[in-house]
Each structure stands twice: as C-alpha cells, then as structure tokens.
C-alpha cells in the first residue's frame, strides 16, 4: 500500500539536514546512511549517498530518474551465488 499523499514522502530528518547543508555549501561529499526506507527527493539529485546493505555501505549516485524511489532499492542485501551447474546437478542421479 502506498503512503498517503497527505503525509508526504518519508525522509530521515538527519539525512535531509546533511543534504541541505551540502547544497548550501556546494560540496560533493559522500553521505553515509542506514536509512534504506528514505524516499529520494529532488534535493538529493547529484549527490552520492552510501546506503547500508547490512554488511557495508554501497555508494549510490542519485540521478533524476531515481526521484520517488527508496534508497534501499539501489543497495541489494542478498548476494547471488549463481545457478547450479548442469553437470553438478546430474552427477548424482542414477539412470
């Protein structure tokens, strides 16, 4: 279910404060955050935000296409080990 328009998008207040300070000073520093649930707002465009994936921080460069999405969408939490080889899967089978 989508968040109510009346409430507006959720953005971690500390993260928003850091982004606004960087916008005022004109700096381009990497901002670390654990707030994967924060919605990307237009103020964040052009910044790099290091989003925590449970193990480490993944740097995510924010573009205009990302506005409205959540930060956590761009930092995967699971490692894909690959599919099993066909040889390994059929090796133990008796025919």
Swiss-Prot record:
Gene Ontology biological-process entries: ribosomal small subunit assembly; translation
One Pfam family named in its UniProt record: Ribosomal_S19
GO CC terms: cytoplasm; small ribosomal subunit
Keyword Manganese: no
InterPro entries tied to this protein: Ribosomal_uS19, Ribosomal_uS19_bac-type, Ribosomal_uS19_SF
Disordered as annotated region, ranges: 76-95
Keywords on record: Ribonucleoprotein, Ribosomal protein, RNA-binding, rRNA-binding
UniProt keyword annotation of Zinc-finger present: no
GO molecular function: rRNA binding; structural constituent of ribosome
Cross-referenced NCBIfam families: rpsS_bact
PANTHER family noted in UniProt: RIBOSOMAL PROTEIN S19P FAMILY MEMBER, SMALL RIBOSOMAL SUBUNIT PROTEIN US19M
Function: Protein S19 forms a complex with S13 that binds strongly to the 16S ribosomal RNA.
Entry's family note: Belongs to the universal ribosomal protein uS19 family.
Protein name: Small ribosomal subunit protein uS19
Lineage: Bacteria, Thermotogati, Thermotogota, Thermotogae, Thermotogales
Gene of this entry: rpsS
């Amino acid at each position: 279910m989508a968040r109510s328009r009346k409430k507006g998008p959720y953005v971690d207040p500390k993260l928003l404060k850091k982004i606004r300070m960087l916008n005022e000073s004109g700096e381009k520093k990497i901002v670390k955050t654990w707030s994967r649930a924060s919605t990307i707002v237009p103020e964040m465009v052009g910044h790099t935000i290091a989003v925590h994936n449970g193990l480490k921080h993944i740097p995510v460069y924010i573009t205009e296409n990302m506005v409205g999405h959540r930060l956590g969408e761009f930092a995967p939490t699971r490692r894909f080990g690959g599919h099993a080889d066909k040889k390994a899967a059929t090796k133990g089978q008796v025919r």
